[in-house]
UniProtKB/Swiss-Prot annotation:
This is Embryonic abundant protein VF30.1. The BURP domain located at the C-terminus has not been identified in non-plant proteins. The USP gene family consists of roughly 10 to 20 members. Glycans are attached at residue 259. The keyword Ribosomal protein does not apply. Keywords: Glycoprotein, Repeat, Secreted, Signal. InterPro entries: BURP, BURP_dom. Seed. It is found in: Secreted. Residues 1-25 form the signal peptide. Residues 68-259 form the BURP domain. The keyword Signal applies. GO terms for cellular component: extracellular region.
């Protein structure tokens, strides 16, 4: 599998987790990527009980995941207001099951309507590879196995809290067909990792209305024939299979891509 070259900037680094290396998962991380702090996105995987006391994606954060737009909208000066569709239930499964199975927005699970089995044991689409992991070691093993190398990087978003109006400052292409790992929206800590086919990933630098600068991982789907037609029409007034469609990825997910530089693993 070939990926586009990833230019790594220090500004793409996630806030790092200030914890000591006491868990076997973090020790395993350090054994593969020495002196590399654990990304905040994956910190839930270190919770001893494997269960939190609340859902990881708060109601005010849902807009990070429910914003659809065109690929040609990704340019400096473009204004975005998060949440241009009210059909959160459709965002959960933006593709029809008959064509692409459970895909890249499954982390928006409503625990009262879906179960982990719906996401982790449902049939996969043709050429789709997915795994549910509940430990940091399992995630590391899965992505290394997929790429056949430890020279990989994880990239994520850092949307500002309580901000939903942004202006694009810069756009950088990350690569094609990345492996996405999403924190499922259940109290039990589970990430769903899968390859996103026929897509291009970008890192978009944004400036919030209060001046806060953030970065957003963005995925553009080039094959939208299996997309939910009602969702597409509500958000963009287009039909499936006509134009590429993009969406932001919220703070509780990351994209794994090859590391073509000599830098340490670096994530936004």
């Amino acid at each position: 599998m070939e990926f586009a070259h990833l230019t790594v900037l220090s500004l793409f680094c996630l806030a790092f987790v200030g914890i000591t290396a006491t868990s076997s998962g973090e020790d395993y991380w350090q054994s593969i990527w020495p002196n590399t702090p654990l990304p905040k996105t994956f910190s839930d995987l270190l919770i001893p009980s494997g269960k939190t006391n609340s859902l990881p994606i708060k109601s005010e954060e849902l807009k990070q995941y429910s914003t659809l737009f065109f690929e040609h909208d990704l340019h400096p000066g473009k204004n975005f207001i998060l949440g241009n569709t009210n059909s959160v239930g459709s965002i959960i499964r933006p593709f029809t099951k008959s064509r692409q199975g459970v895909t890249d927005s499954i982390w928006l699970a409503n625990k009262e309507k879906q179960s982990l089995e719906d996401f982790c044991y449902s049939p996969t689409a043709i050429a789709e590879h997915k795994h549910c992991v509940s430990s940091l070691k399992s995630m590391i093993d899965q992505v290394i196995s997929h790429f056949g190398s430890t020279k990989i990087k994880a990239i994520s978003s850092n949307f500002a809290p309580y901000q939903d109006q942004y202006v694009v400052e810069d756009v950088k292409k990350v690569g094609d067909n990345a492996v996405m790992c999403h924190r499922l929206n259940f109290e039990k800590v589970v990430f769903n990792c899968h390859q996103v086919r026929d897509t291009t990933a970008y890192v978009v630098s944004l400036v919030a209305s209060d001046g806060t600068k953030t970065k957003a991982l963005t995925v553009c789907h080039h094959d939208t024939r299996g997309m939910n037609p009602e969702l597409l029409y509500e958000a963009l007034e287009v039909t499936p299979g006509t134009v590429p469609v993009c969406h932001f990825i919220g703070n509780k997910a990351a994209a794994w891509v090859p590391n073509h530089t000599a830098d340490n693993l670096c994530v936004m």
